[in-house]
């Protein structure tokens, strides 16, 4: 919905600012933590201030699809991303946080995200392919937003799993019309 502003004696139509919120954890999909709570309530606060928002996180194997009502978005899924010379199918799922009237998009891939833990095993050892998982997640978000044809004004990154997003924006996607005016 456009915003109407009175400027110099005229009514000016201003588009809503678009914020792409990328997080490695969001409540209620993962257990409560400081990061997961921020991932849940910050996008809602941004949306409540009149901004248009899209929220993304990885679809970890510990997320219960039935309880959280995740479903695949066929029109966005189906492409392959090449990571380390190997094709990996990109699957996009979506769920809603009803209380916030907010959708969350999930980046999924069987090789990278079907484990029962998020970034480390039960002994606390980081997965050796977390670098590839982070690359897949960052590229998956960019490719999905391109398919949505939704040009964000701002990208907000939360968690080290999103750390490659600013680099990808600067080096790979800066000439893409969807991202040419996007700030991080």
Where are these regions (language model features)?
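A structural signal for isolated positions on well-ordered beta-strands in alpha/beta enzyme cores
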Residues: 20, 54, 154-156
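Conserved nucleotide-sugar donor-interacting segment of glycosyltransferase catalytic cores
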Residues: 131-184
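Short, Lys/Arg-enriched N-terminal segments with co-localized hydrophobic residues
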Residues: 2-13
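A conserved catalytic-core segment of Leloir-type glycosyltransferases
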Residues: 55, 59-147
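Nucleotide-activated donor-dependent transferases that construct or modify glycoconjugates
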Residues: 15-32, 57-59
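Hydrophobic anchor at the start of a short beta-strand
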Residues: 51-53, 104, 152, 184
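A short, glycine/small-residue-rich beta-strand->loop->alpha-helix junction that serves as a flexible
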Residues: 25-38, 64-66
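A short, Lys/Arg-enriched amphipathic alpha-helix followed by its capping loop at the start of a domain
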Residues: 41-51
């Amino acid at each position: 919905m456009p915003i109407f502003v009175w400027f110099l004696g005229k009514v000016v139509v201003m588009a809503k600012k678009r914020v792409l919120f990328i997080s490695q954890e969001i409540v209620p999909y993962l257990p409560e933590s400081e990061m997961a709570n921020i991932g849940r309530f910050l996008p809602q606060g941004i949306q409540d201030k009149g901004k248009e928002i899209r929220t993304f996180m990885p679809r970890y194997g510990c997320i219960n699809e039935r309880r959280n009502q995740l479903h695949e978005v066929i029109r966005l899924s189906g492409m392959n991303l090449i990571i380390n010379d190997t094709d990996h199918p990109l699957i996009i799922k979506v769920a809603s946080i009803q209380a916030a009237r907010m959708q969350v998009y999930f980046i999924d891939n069987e090789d990278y995200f079907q484990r029962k833990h998020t970034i480390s095993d039960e002994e606390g050892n980081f997965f050796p392919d977390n670098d590839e998982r982070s690359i897949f997640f960052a590229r998956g978000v960019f490719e999905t937003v391109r398919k949505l044809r939704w040009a964000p004004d701002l990208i907000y990154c939360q968690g080290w799993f999103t750390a490659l997003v600013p680099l990808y924006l600067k080096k790979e996607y800066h000439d893409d019309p969807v991202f040419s005016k996007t700030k991080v």
